[in-house]
C-alpha cells in the first residue's frame, strides 16, 4: 500500500505516485508551512481516542496481541507536554522564529523533505519517526519495513483525517528493499 495526500492507494499506482511526487513535494515546500501546534493538536485528539480505547480494535488488527502494550509504552512520548518539551529542548527556539546572537541571528526552519527508512522491530515505529518530522514542519517520505502490518498506515490515516493540513507533508510506501530504483527516487527528493 501507498499513503499519499491523505489517501491509501494500491501498490499498482507506485509508478504514477513517484512520477507526480517531485511536483507535489515542491509545491508543498513553496506554498505551505506546518506549525508544530497543528501537529500537536492532531496527535492530542488521536491520543485521546487511544486513551478511551476507541482505537483498540485497530491496534489489535494491525499490531497483534502485543500491540496495545507497545503503543502504551510510547503513548507518554506523544502527549502534548512531552512534544512541547521535545521541541523546546531540541530546537531551542520556536520553529520559524529568530534569535539574536553575538555574530548575527539564527532562524529555526524545516530541513525540507526527510526520507525515513525505519527498522521493523517495533510496531508503529515508522509513524513515530514521521511524527518527529511533522513536528518540525518537514515533508516526510517513509519507507515502511517489510514486517509492517498496516499500523503505520492506519496512524497516518487517522492523523490526516483528524487534521487534513498534515496530508501534503506525509507519504508512506511499502517498497521492498530490493527495489533500489524506487528507493533512489525517494532519496533524491530528500
Where are these regions (language model features)?
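N-terminal Rossmann-like NAD(P)+-binding subdomain of aldehyde/semialdehyde dehydrogenases
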Residues: 1-108
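Rossmann-like NAD(P) dinucleotide-binding subdomain of oxidoreductase/dehydrogenase enzymes
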Residues: 95-190
Amino acid at each position: 500500500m501507498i499513503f499519499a495526500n491523505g489517501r491509501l492507494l494500491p501498490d499498482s499506482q507506485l509508478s504514477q505516485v513517484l512520477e507526480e511526487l517531485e511536483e507535489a513535494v515542491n509545491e508543498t515546500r513553496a506554498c505551505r508551512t506546518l506549525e508544530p501546534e497543528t501537529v500537536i493538536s492532531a496527535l492530542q485528539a488521536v491520543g485521546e481516542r487511544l486513551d478511551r480505547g476507541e482505537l483498540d480494535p485497530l491496534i489489535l488488527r494491525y499490531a497483534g496481541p502485543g500491540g496495545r502494550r507497545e503503543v502504551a509504552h510510547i503513548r507518554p512520548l506523544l502527549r502534548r507536554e512531552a512534544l512541547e518539551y521535545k521541541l523546546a529542548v531540541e530546537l531551542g527556539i520556536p520553529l520559524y522564529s529568530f534569535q539574536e546572537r553575538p555574530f548575527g541571528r539564527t532562524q529555526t526552519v524545516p530541513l525540507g523533505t526527510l526520507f525515513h527508512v525505519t527498522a521493523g522491530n517495533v510496531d508503529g515505529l515508522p509513524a513515530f519517526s514521521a511524527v518527529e518530522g511533522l513536528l518540525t514542519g518537514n515533508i516526510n517520505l517513509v519507507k515502511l519495513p517489510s514486517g509492517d502490518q498496516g499500523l503505520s498506515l492506519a496512524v497516518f490515516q487517522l492523523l490526516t483525517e483528524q487534521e487534513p493540513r498534515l496530508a501534503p507533508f506525509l507519504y508512506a510506501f511499502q517498497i521492498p528493499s530490493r527495489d533500489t530504483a524506487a528507493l533512489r527516487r525517494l532519496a533524491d527528493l530528500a
